[in-house]
Amino acid sequence: MGLSPRLPYLVVEGPIGAGKTTLARRLAADTGARLLLEKPEDNPFLPRFYRDPVGGALPAQLGFLLQRAGQVETFQQGDLFDRHWVADFLFDKDRLFAELTLSPADLALYDTLFQRLAWDVPAPDAVIYLTGPIETLLERIARRGRDYEASIDARYLEDLSARYARFFGRYQAAPVIEVDVSQVDLVAQPELYQELLLALARPRGYTRLRQAELL
C-alpha cells in the first residue's frame, strides 16, 4: 500500500525513545517514499550536552536547528510534490528542546535564528505522534545503548513528554494521529500497522489510535 496522493509529506514524531526512526524507515520502505532522518550522531555538540547540560545546551541546540534546516532545504529543490516523503522529525518541534534546555538569554538568541529559518518551512500533510509511558521510553533508550543517551533520566523525559503533549494538543497545521507505543505494537501486530496505513488514507483532525480502537 502506497501513501495517499494527498500525503506527499508525512512526519513521524514523538519524544526520545518513542520509535520515530524505526517507524519512519518502515513506512518509507513499504510505501516507496523517500526518507528524511534526523542524524543526532552528526551533531558534534550532543555528547557534550549530555555531559554538561548547562554549558553544552546552546551549541547542541543550534547544531540541531541548522542540521534540520539544511535537511528541509531538500524540499525547496522541486521534489516535495514529485515524490512522497517520510521524515522522523517536525521542524517546529525543535523549539520544544530549546525551551527545555536553554537559559532565557540563550533562548532569545535561538529564537532569532529559528524565526529566520522557519518562515518558509512547509507544513506536513499528516503527523504520526508516538507517545508512551516514561518507563517504556527509558527501556527503549537503554535497549538501543547509545552512549550519549546514558544520562537521560525520568525527570527530563517527563518534562519533554509533557511539552510534546501540549504542543500536539494545540497543533493545527496538519492532521495528527496519536499512537501509544505501550498499547500498540506496530511490529509484532501487523494488522495494527495496516490499520495505521488506513488511517493515513483518511487523516482528519486529531485522532488517537490505541489497541482497543484498532482491533
Language-model segments: residues:
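Hydrophobic anchor at the beta1->P-loop junction of P-loop NTPases
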Residues: 12
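P-loop (Walker A) phosphate-binding loop of NTP-binding proteins
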Residues: 15
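Conserved lysine of the Walker
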Residues: 20
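Post-Walker A alpha-helix
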Residues: 23-24
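Conserved substrate/cofactor phosphate-moiety recognition/catalytic segment
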Residues: 29-67
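Glycine-rich phosphate-binding loop used to anchor ATP phosphates in small-molecule kinases
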Residues: 56-122
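A glycine- and Lys/Arg-enriched "phosphate-lid" helix/loop adjacent to the NTP-binding pocket
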Residues: 94-165
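NTP-dependent small-molecule kinase module
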Residues: 142-151, 155-215
